[in-house]
């Protein structure tokens, strides 16, 4: 059954005409990303040549997807909007709250028991408001979306930063915070800064151990974690033909690590085949009829430099297997360089655990190719040195892989098969170790490798590679093992080599599944009661944030001046804290606990200016809030890099932090801060960061004249009585300033 088929038929009936009208209006050929963007304007009459990276534009996405950890807050906000049903097709996916411990057979029932209150809430809200519900064990949100919902030319938002995964099937798919999702769910315009366009020209063909994962790992080394901010990466060139749809999804998925708005591939025969193999023949046919407008125009491809803001050239035939890390996904290292780089940087060279899965690499093809490496180890009698853990991407993939013997190939070398869920990728991993502070190395096919992220150990050096390389390094037990050139010993002491991985893109017998774990949207039913117990520590109804009082912010204590990388993991940790994602008061206890204090080099230890004692960040914030005192956070570049979790914006707002002053922001987090009525400001001169001292009282003036393009003034009152003043800037437009004045975007919408 094709889900939401009437919406899809209606969309394709008008798509090509919308694109043609857009070309006539802007009077030039269009890139593929532009075609999709212009076809989804909230008000088509406002179409014009928007300034990329500058102007905000209102869009009308086709659908919304939410994972269970972020859906709670999104749907709590939606419930306050007073709507009878969602305005567009939507789905909830229970994938984040399942912990990987001993294996799927025991872990899934335990998760259902532990998270029953949250699952019941999400299920009842879904049934009440006409939302599709994918229960625990059904699979990882982005793999399920690719298999069931993604379609060429469409636009979707998702409350997860790796929503761009659907770009592998030709969608503009953007990760957002819950408040943005609520805009779409309630039928309001969804606002986005018109993205810059980075064209990625692919030539050649992958071979040997090189994979689509290595393409994006190489691009991360080129562009870095900030290089894609406020941009769409659009892929083109003859190299596209040799990459499968799931491989393209992998590349789009990790565009999030570049800070990109999203990434997109054009519709082609691989996409058509994927749609047909996943039971969506009619969509493939509809897309084929619109194929000319599901790709960049010929004039663009003939002279890409005239249409893209930046061009990146990648020769696939020269791409090597990469191992990116540790601690940041843009530390790109070809595996052939690791023998020199590892010892030079004092990396722990023994690979203790290899983890295959995540929304990035858990497709049938991923598992089949990784299993071909595992099968060689078994057949050649190679002793596996590390522990191997597998998370399939969906129940359909797990069932099919089990039928085809793929899971058996992993089990024969001692692999542990976990639930169809995120698990270790987001810190939902009960790692069995005798010392959770010991320096060690793990290799994963995941997307992020921030310190502490996987297992909570700050001394775990996590490296990212392809599933195939992850399995090979786990077998070898060495970080510097190059499977293309190095050998291993078999049980008889003979040197043997691993052959390059092989594996079918699609199962030869077709996909199969007994129970997808899906409850289709029912008619909206106002009689369904959504129960939230008053004494619950997992769920809490939201109270509106207070509006701006019309005054400047004077003598705010510095809550923390963070040093170095400060991701959403540092601001609002996942792992054991995921259970509080529906309870703002409780989860606020983890505020900035991973951030490094610039004044002492420690995490979660800041000075409370009221008594001079050093306490946890949330403790200091609560002390200020109890006295009615607003506070401020000062940070470095790319503040809020990482996930879409709006808790990283709601927690400081809840604890009366009014301002985040940073050198620069990650896109999603900056929007989330604005949505929650906070001030996200940047230094005009980044060196002014160095003027901020630990005991400063900080004032922000000029708010009565707060306007697009205006500057505000920060004054630092130092402990010795001296002062420093400097200007700060912002990217707020008129609507976003109205959010600030109303107290939040939701407050503003409620007043309209």
Model-inferred region functions:
Residues 8-11, 15, 20-195, 581-633, ...:
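Long, structured ligand/cofactor-binding scaffold of large enzymes
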Residues 76-80, 306-401, 405, 523-659:
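Non-catalytic terminal/interface segments that mediate subunit docking, oligomerization
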Residues 47, 147, 151, 243-249, ...:
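Short glycine/threonine-rich loop-to-helix capping motif typified by GTGT followed
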Residues 3-4, 68, 151-284, 382, ...:
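Mobile "lid/hinge" segments at catalytic clefts and subdomain interfaces of large enzymes
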Residues 379-429, 435, 643, 649, ...:
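Extended C-terminal subregions enriched in glycine
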Residues 488-505, 670-739, 746-749:
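Acidic, glycine-rich flexible loop/linker segments
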Residues 42, 46, 51-60, 74, ...:
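Terminal amphipathic helices with adjacent charged low-complexity linkers/tails
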């Amino acid at each position: 059954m094709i889900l939401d088929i009437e919406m899809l038929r209606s969309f394709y009936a008008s798509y090509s005409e919308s694109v043609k009208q857009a070309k006539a209006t802007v009077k030039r050929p269009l890139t593929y990303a532009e075609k999709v963007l212009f076809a989804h304007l909230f008000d088509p009459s406002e179409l014009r040549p928007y300034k990329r990276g500058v102007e905000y534009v209102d869009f009308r996405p086709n659908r919304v997807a939410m994972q269970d950890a972020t859906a709670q807050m999104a749907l709590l906000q939606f419930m306050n909007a007073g709507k009878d049903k969602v305005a567009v097709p939507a789905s909830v996916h229970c994938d984040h709250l399942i912990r990987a411990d001993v294996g799927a057979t025991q872990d899934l029932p335990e998760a259902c028991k532990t998270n029953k209150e949250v699952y019941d809430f999400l299920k009842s809200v879904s049934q009440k408001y006409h939302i599709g519900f994918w229960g625990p064990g059904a699979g990882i949100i982005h793999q399920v979306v690719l298999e069931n919902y993604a379609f060429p030319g469409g636009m979707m938002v998702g409350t997860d930063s790796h929503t761009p995964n659907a770009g592998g099937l030709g969608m503009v798919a953007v990760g957002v915070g819950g408040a943005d999702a609520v805009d779409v769910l309630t039928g309001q315009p969804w606002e986005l800064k018109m993205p810059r366009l980075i064209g990625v020209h692919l030539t050649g063909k992958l071979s040997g151990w090189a994979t689509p994962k290595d393409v994006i790992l190489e691009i991360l080394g080129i562009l870095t974690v900030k290089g894609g901010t406020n941009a769409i990466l659009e892929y083109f060139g003859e190299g596209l033909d040799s990459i499968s749809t799931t491989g393209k999804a992998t590349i789009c998925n990790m565009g999030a690590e570049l800070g990109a708005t999203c990434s997109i591939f054009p519709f082609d025969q691989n996409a058509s085949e994927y749609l047909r193999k996943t039971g969506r023949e009619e969509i493939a046919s509809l897309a084929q009829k619109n194929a000319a407008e599901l790709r960049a125009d010929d004039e663009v491809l003939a002279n890409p430099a005239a249409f893209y803001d930046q061009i990146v050239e990648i020769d696939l035939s020269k791409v090597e297997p990469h191992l990116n890390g540790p601690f940041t996904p843009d530390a790109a290292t070809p595996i052939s360089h690791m023998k020199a780089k590892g010892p030079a940087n004092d990396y722990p060279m023994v690979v203790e655990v290899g983890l295959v899965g995540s929304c990035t690499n858990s497709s049938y093809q991923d598992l089949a190719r990784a299993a071909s490496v595992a099968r060689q180890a078994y057949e050649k009698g190679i002793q596996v040195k590390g522990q191997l853990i597998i998370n399939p991407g969906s129940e359909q993939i797990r069932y099919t892989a089990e039928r085809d013997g793929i899971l058996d190939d992993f089990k024969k070398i001692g692999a542990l098969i976990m639930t169809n869920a995120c698990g270790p990728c987001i810190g939902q991993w009960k790692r069995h170790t005798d010392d959770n502070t010991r320096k060690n190395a793990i290799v994963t096919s995941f997307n992020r490798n921030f310190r502490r992220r996987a297992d909570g150990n700050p001394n775990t050096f996590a490296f990212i590679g392809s599933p195939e390389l992850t399995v090979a390094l786990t077998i070898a037990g060495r970080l510097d093992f190059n499977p293309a050139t190095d050998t291993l010993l078999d049980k008889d002491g003979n040197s043997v080599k691993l052959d390059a991985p092989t594996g079918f893109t699609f199962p030869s017998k077709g996909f199969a599944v007994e129970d997808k774990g899906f409850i289709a949207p029912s008619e909206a039913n106002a009689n369904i009661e959504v129960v939230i117990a008053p004494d619950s520590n997992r769920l809490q109804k939201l109270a509106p944030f207070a509006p701006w009082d019309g005054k400047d912010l004077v003598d705010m204590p510095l809550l923390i001046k963070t040093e170095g990388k400060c991701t959403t993991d540092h601001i609002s940790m996942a792992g054991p804290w995921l259970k509080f994602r529906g309870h703002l008061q409780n989860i606020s206890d983890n505020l900035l606990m991973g951030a490094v204090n610039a004044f002492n080099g420690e995490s979660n230890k800041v000075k409370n200016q009221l008594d001079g004692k050093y306490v946890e960040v949330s403790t200091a914030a609560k002390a200020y809030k109890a006295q009615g005192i607003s506070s401020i956070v000062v940070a470095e570049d790319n503040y809020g890099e990482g996930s879409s979790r709006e808790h990283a914006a709601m927690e400081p707002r809840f604890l009366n932090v009014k301002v985040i002053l940073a050198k620069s922001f990650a896109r999603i987090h900056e929007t989330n801060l604005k949505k929650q009525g906070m001030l996200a400001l940047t230094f005009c001169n980044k060196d002014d960061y160095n003027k901020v001292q630990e005991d400063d009282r900080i004032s922000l003036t000029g708010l009565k004249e707060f306007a697009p393009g205006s500057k505000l003034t920060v004054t630092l009152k130092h402990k010795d009585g001296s002062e420093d003043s400097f200007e700060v800037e912002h990217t707020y437009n008129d609507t976003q300033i109205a959010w600030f004045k109303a107290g939040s975007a939701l407050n503003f919408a409620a007043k309209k």
